[in-house]
Amino acid sequence: MARLIDQFERLPGIGPRTAQRLALHLLNQPQEQIHQFADALLAARTQVGQCQTCFHLSADPECEICRNPERRNGVICVVADSRDLLALERTREFHGRYHVLGGLISPMDGIGPELLRVTELVQRISNEEISEVILALTPSVEGDTTSLYLGRLLKPFCSVSRIAYGLPMGSELEYADEVTLSRALEGRRPV
Amino acid sequence: MARLIDQFERLPGIGPRTAQRLALHLLNQPQEQIHQFADALLAARTQVGQCQTCFHLSADPECEICRNPERRNGVICVVADSRDLLALERTREFHGRYHVLGGLISPMDGIGPELLRVTELVQRISNEEISEVILALTPSVEGDTTSLYLGRLLKPFCSVSRIAYGLPMGSELEYADEVTLSRALEGRRPV
Protein backbone atom coordinates (compact mmCIF):
# COMPACT_ATOMS: atom_id res chain seq x y z
CA MET A 1 0.00 0.00 0.00
CA ALA A 2 2.75 2.44 0.98
CA ARG A 3 4.52 1.65 -2.31
CA LEU A 4 1.41 2.43 -4.35
CA ILE A 5 0.87 5.72 -2.49
CA ASP A 6 4.51 6.57 -3.11
CA GLN A 7 4.11 5.93 -6.85
CA PHE A 8 1.11 8.24 -7.08
CA GLU A 9 2.94 10.93 -5.12
CA ARG A 10 5.63 11.05 -7.80
CA LEU A 11 3.10 12.23 -10.38
CA PRO A 12 2.98 15.97 -11.06
CA GLY A 13 0.31 17.86 -9.13
CA ILE A 14 -0.46 14.99 -6.76
CA GLY A 15 0.35 15.48 -3.09
CA PRO A 16 0.42 12.92 -0.25
CA ARG A 17 -3.28 13.24 0.56
CA THR A 18 -4.51 12.85 -3.02
CA ALA A 19 -2.07 9.96 -3.50
CA GLN A 20 -3.59 8.22 -0.48
CA ARG A 21 -7.12 8.83 -1.71
CA LEU A 22 -6.31 7.45 -5.17
CA ALA A 23 -4.60 4.36 -3.72
CA LEU A 24 -7.52 3.65 -1.37
CA HIS A 25 -10.00 4.09 -4.21
CA LEU A 26 -8.12 1.58 -6.37
CA LEU A 27 -8.01 -0.99 -3.57
CA ASN A 28 -11.81 -0.93 -3.52
CA GLN A 29 -12.06 -1.65 -7.25
CA PRO A 30 -12.55 -5.17 -8.67
CA GLN A 31 -9.38 -7.14 -9.39
CA GLU A 32 -10.05 -6.88 -13.14
CA GLN A 33 -10.02 -3.09 -13.12
CA ILE A 34 -6.61 -3.08 -11.43
CA HIS A 35 -5.25 -5.43 -14.06
CA GLN A 36 -6.54 -3.20 -16.85
CA PHE A 37 -4.87 -0.20 -15.24
CA ALA A 38 -1.53 -2.01 -14.91
CA ASP A 39 -1.79 -3.26 -18.50
CA ALA A 40 -2.54 0.23 -19.81
CA LEU A 41 0.52 1.56 -17.97
CA LEU A 42 2.85 -1.09 -19.38
CA ALA A 43 1.39 -0.91 -22.89
CA ALA A 44 1.70 2.89 -23.01
CA ARG A 45 5.33 2.70 -21.95
CA THR A 46 6.31 -0.04 -24.37
CA GLN A 47 4.12 0.73 -27.38
CA VAL A 48 3.93 4.52 -27.60
CA GLY A 49 6.99 5.87 -29.30
CA GLN A 50 7.65 8.83 -31.52
CA CYS A 51 6.60 9.53 -35.08
CA GLN A 52 9.73 9.28 -37.21
CA THR A 53 8.72 12.31 -39.23
CA CYS A 54 7.35 14.89 -36.78
CA PHE A 55 8.29 13.32 -33.38
CA HIS A 56 4.75 13.53 -32.04
CA LEU A 57 3.73 10.65 -29.75
CA SER A 58 2.67 7.69 -31.86
CA ALA A 59 2.23 3.94 -31.55
CA ASP A 60 3.18 3.55 -35.22
CA PRO A 61 6.36 4.64 -37.02
CA GLU A 62 4.32 7.48 -38.51
CA CYS A 63 1.71 9.38 -36.48
CA GLU A 64 -1.92 9.88 -37.46
CA ILE A 65 -1.34 13.50 -38.51
CA CYS A 66 1.62 12.69 -40.75
CA ARG A 67 -0.33 9.80 -42.33
CA ASN A 68 -3.50 11.80 -42.89
CA PRO A 69 -3.74 12.56 -46.65
CA GLU A 70 -6.26 15.33 -46.02
CA ARG A 71 -3.81 17.51 -44.16
CA ARG A 72 -2.03 20.20 -46.12
CA ASN A 73 1.56 19.58 -47.10
CA GLY A 74 3.92 22.50 -47.38
CA VAL A 75 3.13 24.14 -44.03
CA ILE A 76 4.89 22.99 -40.86
CA CYS A 77 3.92 24.22 -37.41
CA VAL A 78 6.86 23.94 -34.99
CA VAL A 79 5.96 23.24 -31.34
CA ALA A 80 8.04 22.54 -28.23
CA ASP A 81 6.25 19.32 -27.24
CA SER A 82 3.28 17.04 -27.90
CA ARG A 83 1.14 18.84 -25.31
CA ASP A 84 1.38 22.05 -27.32
CA LEU A 85 0.56 20.13 -30.50
CA LEU A 86 -2.59 18.75 -28.88
CA ALA A 87 -3.58 22.26 -27.73
CA LEU A 88 -3.29 23.52 -31.32
CA GLU A 89 -5.25 20.53 -32.64
CA ARG A 90 -8.11 21.43 -30.30
CA THR A 91 -8.54 24.74 -32.15
CA ARG A 92 -9.23 22.85 -35.44
CA GLU A 93 -7.75 25.87 -37.21
CA PHE A 94 -4.47 24.42 -38.40
CA HIS A 95 -4.58 21.87 -41.21
CA GLY A 96 -0.90 21.47 -42.03
CA ARG A 97 1.80 19.24 -40.54
CA TYR A 98 3.76 19.58 -37.29
CA HIS A 99 7.29 19.27 -36.02
CA VAL A 100 7.89 18.59 -32.33
CA LEU A 101 11.19 20.14 -31.23
CA GLY A 102 11.37 18.33 -27.91
CA GLY A 103 11.96 21.46 -25.85
CA LEU A 104 13.19 25.03 -26.18
CA ILE A 105 16.68 26.51 -26.32
CA SER A 106 17.64 27.44 -22.76
CA PRO A 107 21.28 28.43 -22.14
CA MET A 108 20.52 28.63 -18.40
CA ASP A 109 19.67 24.91 -18.35
CA GLY A 110 22.42 24.02 -20.82
CA ILE A 111 19.92 23.19 -23.59
CA GLY A 112 21.33 24.21 -26.95
CA PRO A 113 19.83 23.61 -30.40
CA GLU A 114 21.87 20.39 -30.74
CA LEU A 115 19.72 18.80 -28.02
CA LEU A 116 16.52 19.63 -29.94
CA ARG A 117 15.23 18.18 -33.22
CA VAL A 118 16.53 21.08 -35.27
CA THR A 119 18.65 19.08 -37.72
CA GLU A 120 15.62 16.88 -38.41
CA LEU A 121 13.54 20.01 -39.10
CA VAL A 122 16.11 21.41 -41.54
CA GLN A 123 16.23 18.01 -43.24
CA ARG A 124 12.46 17.97 -43.66
CA ILE A 125 12.49 21.45 -45.13
CA SER A 126 15.15 20.50 -47.67
CA ASN A 127 13.42 17.20 -48.57
CA GLU A 128 9.75 18.26 -48.64
CA GLU A 129 8.44 21.28 -50.48
CA ILE A 130 7.75 23.67 -47.60
CA SER A 131 6.34 27.13 -48.22
CA GLU A 132 5.84 28.27 -44.59
CA VAL A 133 7.09 27.37 -41.15
CA ILE A 134 4.89 28.65 -38.30
CA LEU A 135 6.68 28.87 -34.95
CA ALA A 136 4.13 28.21 -32.19
CA LEU A 137 6.38 28.60 -29.15
CA THR A 138 5.50 30.01 -25.72
CA PRO A 139 5.93 33.76 -25.14
CA SER A 140 8.94 33.45 -22.78
CA VAL A 141 12.69 34.06 -22.88
CA GLU A 142 13.27 30.48 -24.06
CA GLY A 143 10.48 30.71 -26.65
CA ASP A 144 11.86 34.03 -27.95
CA THR A 145 15.42 32.69 -28.14
CA THR A 146 14.29 29.58 -30.00
CA SER A 147 12.12 31.58 -32.41
CA LEU A 148 14.99 33.95 -33.15
CA TYR A 149 17.39 31.06 -33.72
CA LEU A 150 15.02 29.11 -35.97
CA GLY A 151 13.98 32.25 -37.83
CA ARG A 152 17.58 33.00 -38.82
CA LEU A 153 18.30 29.37 -39.65
CA LEU A 154 15.23 28.74 -41.82
CA LYS A 155 14.60 32.06 -43.53
CA PRO A 156 16.89 31.21 -46.50
CA PHE A 157 14.66 28.19 -47.27
CA CYS A 158 11.06 29.29 -46.69
CA SER A 159 8.93 31.98 -45.10
CA VAL A 160 8.96 31.82 -41.30
CA SER A 161 6.18 33.27 -39.14
CA ARG A 162 5.40 33.33 -35.46
CA ILE A 163 2.01 33.12 -33.72
CA ALA A 164 0.70 36.41 -32.35
CA TYR A 165 1.36 37.61 -28.83
CA GLY A 166 -1.09 40.08 -27.35
CA LEU A 167 -4.31 40.32 -25.42
CA PRO A 168 -6.06 36.98 -24.85
CA MET A 169 -9.72 36.79 -25.85
CA GLY A 170 -12.22 38.14 -23.36
CA SER A 171 -9.54 39.98 -21.39
CA GLU A 172 -9.63 43.61 -20.28
CA LEU A 173 -6.97 46.12 -21.29
CA GLU A 174 -7.06 47.43 -17.75
CA TYR A 175 -5.93 44.15 -16.21
CA ALA A 176 -3.37 43.17 -18.85
CA ASP A 177 0.24 43.20 -17.65
CA GLU A 178 2.51 45.82 -19.18
CA VAL A 179 4.65 43.45 -21.23
CA THR A 180 1.58 41.89 -22.87
CA LEU A 181 0.13 45.31 -23.59
CA SER A 182 3.45 46.51 -25.06
CA ARG A 183 3.59 43.45 -27.31
CA ALA A 184 -0.02 43.98 -28.35
CA LEU A 185 0.77 47.59 -29.33
CA GLU A 186 3.97 46.59 -31.11
CA GLY A 187 2.22 43.76 -32.94
CA ARG A 188 -0.73 45.83 -34.14
CA ARG A 189 -2.14 44.93 -37.52
CA PRO A 190 -3.99 46.85 -40.21
CA VAL A 191 -7.76 46.55 -39.86
CA MET B 1 -22.12 55.70 11.23
CA ALA B 2 -24.63 53.51 9.37
CA ARG B 3 -24.81 56.16 6.64
CA LEU B 4 -21.03 56.13 6.19
CA ILE B 5 -20.95 52.32 6.03
CA ASP B 6 -23.75 52.43 3.49
CA GLN B 7 -21.79 54.89 1.32
CA PHE B 8 -18.74 52.64 1.31
CA GLU B 9 -20.86 49.62 0.46
CA ARG B 10 -21.99 51.29 -2.74
CA LEU B 11 -18.42 51.31 -4.06
CA PRO B 12 -17.48 48.52 -6.47
CA GLY B 13 -15.75 45.54 -4.86
CA ILE B 14 -16.53 46.60 -1.29
CA GLY B 15 -18.83 44.36 0.74
CA PRO B 16 -20.56 45.04 4.08
CA ARG B 17 -17.60 43.82 6.19
CA THR B 18 -14.98 45.86 4.38
CA ALA B 19 -17.31 48.87 4.44
CA GLN B 20 -17.60 48.56 8.21
CA ARG B 21 -13.82 48.21 8.62
CA LEU B 22 -13.18 51.31 6.50
CA ALA B 23 -15.76 53.37 8.36
CA LEU B 24 -14.37 52.33 11.77
CA HIS B 25 -10.84 53.11 10.60
CA LEU B 26 -11.87 56.61 9.51
CA LEU B 27 -13.59 57.31 12.83
CA ASN B 28 -10.26 56.72 14.55
CA GLN B 29 -8.44 59.23 12.35
CA PRO B 30 -7.85 62.88 13.41
CA GLN B 31 -10.61 65.35 12.47
CA GLU B 32 -8.29 67.01 9.96
CA GLN B 33 -7.80 63.80 7.96
CA ILE B 34 -11.57 63.38 7.64
CA HIS B 35 -11.91 66.93 6.35
CA GLN B 36 -9.20 66.34 3.77
CA PHE B 37 -10.98 63.19 2.59
CA ALA B 38 -14.31 65.01 2.26
CA ASP B 39 -12.62 67.90 0.46
CA ALA B 40 -10.89 65.56 -1.97
CA LEU B 41 -14.22 63.89 -2.75
CA LEU B 42 -15.99 67.17 -3.42
CA ALA B 43 -13.09 68.65 -5.36
CA ALA B 44 -12.79 65.59 -7.59
CA ARG B 45 -16.48 65.70 -8.41
CA THR B 46 -16.60 69.41 -9.15
CA GLN B 47 -13.21 70.01 -10.71
CA VAL B 48 -12.39 66.95 -12.76
CA GLY B 49 -14.02 67.14 -16.15
CA GLN B 50 -13.10 65.95 -19.59
CA CYS B 51 -10.39 67.09 -21.94
CA GLN B 52 -12.09 68.89 -24.80
CA THR B 53 -9.79 67.27 -27.33
CA CYS B 54 -9.43 63.62 -26.32
CA PHE B 55 -12.11 63.29 -23.58
CA HIS B 56 -9.67 61.85 -21.04
CA LEU B 57 -10.29 62.90 -17.43
CA SER B 58 -8.80 66.33 -16.83
CA ALA B 59 -9.12 69.25 -14.43
CA ASP B 60 -8.24 71.65 -17.25
CA PRO B 61 -9.95 72.17 -20.61
CA GLU B 62 -7.06 70.26 -22.17
CA CYS B 63 -5.51 67.21 -20.48
CA GLU B 64 -1.81 66.75 -19.71
CA ILE B 65 -1.28 64.39 -22.62
CA CYS B 66 -2.88 66.69 -25.19
CA ARG B 67 -0.87 69.65 -23.82
CA ASN B 68 2.46 67.77 -23.74
CA PRO B 69 4.57 69.09 -26.64
CA GLU B 70 6.87 66.06 -26.45
CA ARG B 71 4.17 63.63 -27.50
CA ARG B 72 3.97 62.70 -31.13
CA ASN B 73 1.26 64.29 -33.21
CA GLY B 74 -0.22 62.34 -36.09
CA VAL B 75 -0.88 59.09 -34.26
CA ILE B 76 -4.11 58.64 -32.28
CA CYS B 77 -4.76 55.64 -30.06
CA VAL B 78 -8.50 55.04 -29.64
CA VAL B 79 -9.60 53.55 -26.29
CA ALA B 80 -13.00 52.80 -24.74
CA ASP B 81 -12.42 54.70 -21.49
CA SER B 82 -9.87 56.49 -19.30
CA ARG B 83 -9.00 53.30 -17.43
CA ASP B 84 -7.76 51.72 -20.65
CA LEU B 85 -5.82 54.90 -21.45
CA LEU B 86 -4.08 54.70 -18.06
CA ALA B 87 -3.26 51.00 -18.65
CA LEU B 88 -1.59 51.91 -21.96
CA GLU B 89 0.28 54.80 -20.35
CA ARG B 90 1.77 52.38 -17.81
CA THR B 91 3.53 50.51 -20.64
CA ARG B 92 5.43 53.73 -21.60
CA GLU B 93 5.46 52.39 -25.15
CA PHE B 94 3.01 54.73 -26.80
CA HIS B 95 4.07 58.32 -27.36
CA GLY B 96 1.22 59.64 -29.49
CA ARG B 97 -2.16 61.11 -28.59
CA TYR B 98 -5.36 59.41 -27.43
CA HIS B 99 -9.07 59.54 -28.10
CA VAL B 100 -11.47 58.24 -25.44
CA LEU B 101 -14.65 56.87 -27.09
CA GLY B 102 -16.65 56.67 -23.88
CA GLY B 103 -17.68 53.04 -24.42
CA LEU B 104 -18.06 50.41 -27.13
CA ILE B 105 -20.78 49.78 -29.69
CA SER B 106 -23.19 47.27 -28.17
CA PRO B 107 -26.47 46.67 -30.01
CA MET B 108 -27.60 44.41 -27.13
CA ASP B 109 -27.42 47.36 -24.73
CA GLY B 110 -28.72 49.82 -27.30
CA ILE B 111 -25.38 51.61 -27.59
CA GLY B 112 -24.84 52.75 -31.15
CA PRO B 113 -21.95 54.84 -32.51
CA GLU B 114 -24.03 58.03 -32.05
CA LEU B 115 -23.72 57.60 -28.26
CA LEU B 116 -19.92 57.43 -28.49
CA ARG B 117 -17.44 60.17 -29.38
CA VAL B 118 -17.13 59.04 -32.98
CA THR B 119 -18.07 62.33 -34.63
CA GLU B 120 -15.45 64.07 -32.51
CA LEU B 121 -12.86 61.51 -33.64
CA VAL B 122 -13.70 62.03 -37.32
CA GLN B 123 -13.49 65.77 -36.77
CA ARG B 124 -10.03 65.45 -35.21
CA ILE B 125 -8.85 63.34 -38.12
CA SER B 126 -10.05 65.89 -40.65
CA ASN B 127 -8.61 68.85 -38.69
CA GLU B 128 -5.26 67.44 -37.53
CA GLU B 129 -2.79 65.69 -39.80
CA ILE B 130 -3.23 62.07 -38.71
CA SER B 131 -1.21 59.29 -40.30
CA GLU B 132 -2.33 56.35 -38.15
CA VAL B 133 -5.22 55.47 -35.86
CA ILE B 134 -4.51 52.55 -33.49
CA LEU B 135 -7.64 50.86 -32.15
CA ALA B 136 -6.88 49.57 -28.64
CA LEU B 137 -10.21 47.96 -27.81
CA THR B 138 -10.91 44.84 -25.75
CA PRO B 139 -11.01 41.50 -27.55
CA SER B 140 -14.77 40.95 -27.17
CA VAL B 141 -17.86 41.05 -29.38
CA GLU B 142 -18.32 44.75 -28.58
CA GLY B 143 -14.64 45.52 -29.18
CA ASP B 144 -14.70 43.63 -32.50
CA THR B 145 -17.89 45.40 -33.63
CA THR B 146 -16.49 48.81 -32.74
CA SER B 147 -13.14 48.09 -34.43
CA LEU B 148 -14.90 46.94 -37.59
CA TYR B 149 -17.13 50.02 -37.63
CA LEU B 150 -14.31 52.49 -37.00
CA GLY B 151 -12.04 50.68 -39.46
CA ARG B 152 -14.55 51.13 -42.29
CA LEU B 153 -15.31 54.71 -41.28
CA LEU B 154 -11.71 55.92 -40.98
CA LYS B 155 -9.85 53.97 -43.66
CA PRO B 156 -10.51 56.59 -46.36
CA PHE B 157 -8.67 59.18 -44.24
CA CYS B 158 -5.67 57.40 -42.66
CA SER B 159 -4.21 53.98 -41.96
CA VAL B 160 -6.09 52.12 -39.22
CA SER B 161 -4.53 49.34 -37.16
CA ARG B 162 -5.62 47.21 -34.25
CA ILE B 163 -3.58 45.97 -31.29
CA ALA B 164 -2.59 42.30 -31.45
CA TYR B 165 -4.69 39.53 -29.95
CA GLY B 166 -2.90 36.31 -29.04
CA LEU B 167 -1.02 34.60 -26.26
CA PRO B 168 -0.29 36.83 -23.26
CA MET B 169 3.32 36.96 -22.08
CA GLY B 170 4.48 34.14 -19.84
CA SER B 171 1.50 31.96 -20.75
CA GLU B 172 1.60 28.33 -21.87
CA LEU B 173 0.15 27.18 -25.19
CA GLU B 174 -1.26 24.19 -23.37
CA TYR B 175 -3.48 26.28 -21.11
CA ALA B 176 -4.57 28.87 -23.67
CA ASP B 177 -8.25 28.76 -24.59
CA GLU B 178 -9.08 27.72 -28.13
CA VAL B 179 -10.30 31.10 -29.35
CA THR B 180 -7.11 32.82 -28.18
CA LEU B 181 -4.98 30.15 -29.80
CA SER B 182 -6.95 30.42 -33.07
CA ARG B 183 -6.46 34.17 -33.08
CA ALA B 184 -2.76 33.75 -32.34
CA LEU B 185 -2.42 31.39 -35.31
CA GLU B 186 -4.47 33.63 -37.57
CA GLY B 187 -2.50 36.70 -36.50
CA ARG B 188 0.93 35.16 -37.03
CA ARG B 189 3.64 37.50 -38.22
CA PRO B 190 6.83 37.06 -40.22
CA VAL B 191 9.87 36.55 -37.98
From Swiss-Prot, chains A, B:
Belongs to the RecR family. Residues 74-168 form the Toprim domain. This is Recombination protein RecR. PROSITE patterns: TOPRIM. Transmembrane segments: none annotated. CDD domains: TOPRIM_recR (cd01025). It comes from Synechococcus sp. (strain CC9605). Keywords: DNA damage, DNA recombination, DNA repair, Metal-binding, Zinc, Zinc-finger. The lineage of its organism: Bacteria, Bacillati, Cyanobacteriota, Cyanophyceae, Synechococcales. The keyword Metal-binding applies. The gene is recR. One of its GO terms (biological process) is DNA recombination. Pfam families: RecR_C, RecR_HhH, RecR_ZnF, Toprim_4. May play a role in DNA repair. It seems to be involved in an RecBC-independent recombinational process of DNA repair. It may act with RecF and RecO. One of its GO terms (molecular function) is DNA binding. A zinc finger (C4-type) spans 51-66.
